[in-house]
């Protein structure tokens, strides 16, 4: 079964950064990565996931429309077995 990491972020550069960071794992076929640019697209992908095992969801917190914090309970309700990591590029100022 194919293992999938789903990354949810509205910034287009994120896909390039993640693919570069995990290039060895991706080339070795340890898992695949898919990218959703919004919460609704991520929820659709989660609902349609057949023949793959989602092993991790990483979501940006700050996105237009549905924020990552709004996505979190919906994704957990759909897939309570999948860990979700919230990420952000913004610091807390300290």
Where are these regions (language model features)?
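Two-component/phosphorelay signaling modules centered on CheY-like receiver
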Residues: 12-34
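His-Asp phosphorelay/catalytic-motif detector in bacterial-type signaling
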Residues: 2, 30, 52-55, 78-83
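Receiver (REC) domain active-site loop signature in two-component systems and cognate sites
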Residues: 61-63
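Hydrophobic residue at a beta-alpha junction
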Residues: 37, 65-66, 79
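Short amphipathic alpha-helix used as the core "switch/output" element in two-component signaling
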Residues: 44-47, 69-81
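Acidic, metal-coordinating helix/loop segments flanking the phosphotransfer/catalytic sites
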Residues: 19, 35-56
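Negatively charged, flexible loop motifs adjacent to catalytic sites
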Residues: 90-94
